[in-house]
From Swiss-Prot:
It is found in: Cytoplasm. Gene3D superfamilies: Bira Bifunctional Protein, Domain 2, GAD-like domain, Nucleic acid-binding proteins. Residues 206-209 are annotated as: Aspartate. Signal peptide: none annotated. Its EC number is 6.1.1.23. The record marks 38 as: Important for tRNA non-discrimination. The gene is aspS. This is Aspartate--tRNA(Asp/Asn) ligase. It comes from the Bacteria. Its main location: cytoplasm. Belongs to the class-II aminoacyl-tRNA synthetase family. Type 1 subfamily.
Length: 592
């Protein structure tokens, strides 16, 4: 059985001891990273979340501690009392923060023993993610994982400090709410007290934060858990954390300005980086035209160019068909890549096809000639204008896609990113922020044969576009904004509708009958009757923001206990079956 502390108190963290502590008597506690036996001396590397300190056990200093340490192995939990000693110059270890000192142990308590762990507790450990997730409590002992979670904590601390300083109030909203599915599926919770009725777990605190604005809390925030029963996708979690913010009596500009200051403070405090503000801004339309996506990575160029007008009269069938079907012809210039081998060009063609393109036209620009499968279909004048539009020089490779706009944009956006990586055009140490604004308010869902909200049904249309809501819904722009960092959307929000009549019109355009709208959102519509201020806000994905700041490859590395890509917890084996008795209490029958 492990020993008890019996009043022994920790005086210092392992990684915080320095030469200033020499000759002090200290008590440290932690896990054994490594044990080395040098005959008359035993060396223990003791680890806690702050780092490692070397502890020396000598028979001459304490025969009792020296005898006891013989049984100690990796991951044993120890409490050690001893004296801090300066290391001899030749024994200094510059790789650790405590490398100039060591502790000579007087007392040793073995608080807990450990079996041999299934993998080494070190960052170099080459172990599968499945094993790491099964033994997550061991994985979290690794320095990189501890650093990730400490950085995540630092982000939330900066957010809280900044918002508190700026007059915001942290308010919690319910986790058991009414199901109002619009977008992803709700997680449902059966009510035992009301058989046949269900709560939903919140996909976001959206409606409640709007109700808080109507309640008079004009500056709200919350670090909120959100849950969405989404189809399985790479790097998505069924539960995730949002930095949720809402403000009253504001317009778009007010929301963007305070959020820029907050983001700048987060990056200053966590990475020591000065982020220039204000951030760049692109309209949704401009972002799509220039980068093929509303999540552009601005760390490199290779922008899309529209060639449709140049080839409008072309006899080339590929171009002709695309333009006839209201599509477009667009291209990018891969500087200095003209000599790309045919095999790699063919790979790019196949890559383009995975995004729905029927093909990919390439043009190699050399000093004295232009090589392309399309030379025989394009006139000399057309080719000349294409080269001019794409600012082609000798040595460049031009890639062109002709199809429906959505396919052209999607294909070229992915090609641009792929080639940016291949040719090392992306500076990994750069942070490029951009606000994407003026989103379309609505999209048309071919499957459901109705208009759906691009963001959510409470987003306000731009004032000048309100009159188009019923006549030309797809032309209506929203007072919505996303914040994109290095090609990843880290947050998004909007100014909300605060007028009952406008909200009714919005529901009608979305195909909700008045009855259906009241059934789902009646409590919000009722609240609007009693004086709602203009309000708006934003929500950030904390997991994704932490992933970028820590330089992690996946959001699972910045969440303490994540699910797998299949939404399973390998450590606790959730989700799991429950007993018949539990189901009976809830009046539920499982029909598989």
């Amino acid at each position: 059985m492990g020993e008890q502390l019996n009043g022994l108190k920790r005086t210092h963290m392992c990684g915080e001891l320095t030469v200033e502590d020499v000759d002090k008597s200290v008590v440290v506690m932690g896990w054994v990273q490594r044990r080395r036996d040098h005959g008359g001396l035993v060396f223990i590397d003791l680890r806690d979340r702050t780092g490692i300190v070397q502890v020396v056990f000598s028979n001459e200093v304490s025969s009792e501690a020296f005898e006891k340490v013989q049984s100690v192995r990796s991951e044993y939990v120890l409490a050690i009392e001893g004296k801090v000693v300066k290391r001899a110059p030749e024994n200094v270890n510059p790789k650790i923060s405590t490398g100039e000192i060591e502790i000579y142990a007087n007392t040793l308590k073995i608080l807990s023993k450990s079996e041999t762990p299934p993998f080494p507790i070190e960052d170099r450990s080459n172990v599968s993610e499945a094993i790491r997730l099964k033994y997550r409590y061991l994985d979290l002992r690794r320095p990189s994982m501890q650093q990730n979670l400490m950085t995540r904590f630092k982000i939330t601390k900066v957010v809280r400090d900044f918002l508190n300083r700026n007059g915001f109030i942290e308010i919690e909203t319910p986790l058991l709410i009414k199901s109002t599915p619009e977008g992803a599926r709700d997680y449902l919770v059966p009510s035992r007290i009301y058989p046949g009725k269900f709560y939903a777990l919140p996909q976001s605190p959206q409606i409640f934060k709007q109700l808080l604005m109507i309640s008079g809390f004009d500056k709200y925030y919350q670090i909120a858990k959100c849950l969405r029963d989404e189809d399985l996708r790479a790097d998505r979690q069924p539960e995730f954390t949002q930095i949720d913010i809402e403000m009253s009596f504001v317009e778009v500009e007010d929301v963007l300005k305070i959020n820029e200051k907050m983001i700048a403070e987060i990056f200053k405090e966590t990475l020591g980086i000065d982020v220039p503000i204000p951030f760049k801004r692109l309209s949704y339309q401009e972002s799509m035209e220039r980068f093929g996506t509303d999540k552009p990575d601005l760390r490199f160029g290779m922008e899309l160019k529209d060639l449709s007008d140049i080839v409008a009269q072309s006899e080339f069938n590929v171009f002709k068909t695309a333009l006839k079907n209201n599509g477009s012809v667009r291209g990018i210039n891969v500087k200095g890549a003209a000599s790309m081998p045919r095999r790699q060009l063919d790979e790019l063609v196949e890559f383009a096809k995975t995004y729905g393109a029927k093909g990919l036209l390439w043009i190699q620009v050399f000093e004295k000639e232009v090589k392309s499968p399309a030379t025989k279909f394009l006139s000399e004048e057309e080719m000349k204008k294409i080269l001019e539009r794409l600012e082609a020089e000798a040595g460049d490779l031009l890639l062109i896609v002709a199809d429906k706009d959505e396919i052209v944009f999607d294909t070229l956006a992915h090609l641009r990113l792929e080639l940016g990586k291949r040719f090392n055009l992306i500076d990994e140490n750069k942070y490029e922020f951009v606000w994407i604004v003026d989103f379309p308010l609505l999209e048309y869902d071919e499957g459901e044969k109705r208009y759906v909200a691009k963001h959510h049904p409470f987003t306000a249309p731009k004032d000048e576009d309100i009159e188009l809501l019923e006549k030309e819904p797809l032309k209506v722009r929203a007072k919505a904004y996303d914040i994109v960092l290095n090609g990843t959307e880290i947050g998004g929000g909007s100014i909300r509708i605060h007028d009952t009549e406008l909200q009714k019109r919005m529901f009608k355009v979305l195909g909700f009958s008045e009855e259906k709208a009241w059934e789902r959102f009646g409590f919000l519509m009722e609240a609007f009757k009693y004086g709602a201020p203009p309000h708006g806000g934003i929500a950030y994905g904390l997991d994704r923001l932490a992933m970028i700041i820590t330089g992690s490859d996946t959001i699972r590395d910045v969440i303490a206990f994540p699910k797998t890509q299949n939404a399973v917890c390998l450590m606790t084996d959730a989700p799991s079956e429950v007993s018949e008795e539990q189901l009976k209490e809830l009046h539920i029958k499982v029909d598989l």
